[in-house]
Amino acid sequence: MPFVFPDTTVSKDYFTDNNASGGEGGSPFDFVKLDKGAVLKKIKAWKDNWLISGVEVWMSDGSNKLVGKRGGPSGEFTFRDGELIKKLNVQASAPYSSVLKRRRLGAIWLETDKERSWGIYAHSLTEDGSYWPDVGSGICCGIFGSAGDAVDRLGFAMLQPISRAVLTDVKYPNLDMEIVASTPTTVAHQVFSNGTDLDQTFELSGSRSVTITREWSLTTSLSMTISVEVTAGIPEVVSAKTGFSWTVSSLATHSVSTSNTETKTWRWPLVCPPHSRILGEATMYADDIDTEYEADMELQLKNGKTYRYHVNGVYNGLNARSGNVKLDNLGPYTGN
């Protein structure tokens, strides 16, 4: 049977397992970064004869943690972006420590969904020390256990399977400071003639191919590892008494990143006086914006639990809107 010790600071509401494998000595530690949306990026371990003397981990938010001590033969593994743990063995050592016969951490082995594997093994391991925790979603949010001059026991905080991830409560704190596009693009230029005794109404129309983009940047690797929906309003330009300004549209569900090229068509009615020629010109604006956003990332887990953590990033978007219509009277229409 495995030699494991539960850690009550690691909630099984959010993680598949709170057991640390090894022995009962050392001082407890807890280095779990779910509240930052951070995931394990690199692990390095050192061994000394029959035990693992040190383990150091680096997280995607830039933080790191060393337990035990560096020294002796070592091995390390760096995760690629989006790479998940598929199998994990955290193995206790054989009971070789002093009179108390205490065990410590003896080996770590993992395999990923990219068919890569890594491990480090102390001497004289026994099969009864193997412990294969449920890896859940495959996302590791940190480590926990106990250590002193070596690593007594170790556990990996493996996130429960995720059913849905939603970026919600999105706010754009600097939106009122963003500049509205001021350079128009001409999309229609046409002359109309009226040789009758009555006003005539014509339609000025114009089209332009525009690439509409929306993207909420995600700065934590957890967010980049899973598929994320966004429930938010979109920054857009509206007419106000003093001109044009940015506002936020009504809530809708979006992909975290979209880019669609579409043909925008605008039509404007123009009235031409009797026996006159007029020139109609119309413009459009492409409103490009890069602005900071703040939001909550909501993880809806398959066990029915929900976890939220705060995120921030940059929203990048481009919208197209109708501009101005200019009407010039070209003088009398002579019929030529």
Residues of each region from the PLM?
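Membrane-inserting effector segments that mediate pore formation, membrane fusion
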Residues: 211-262
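Lectin-type carbohydrate-recognition ectodomains
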Residues: 1-207, 264-276, 281-333
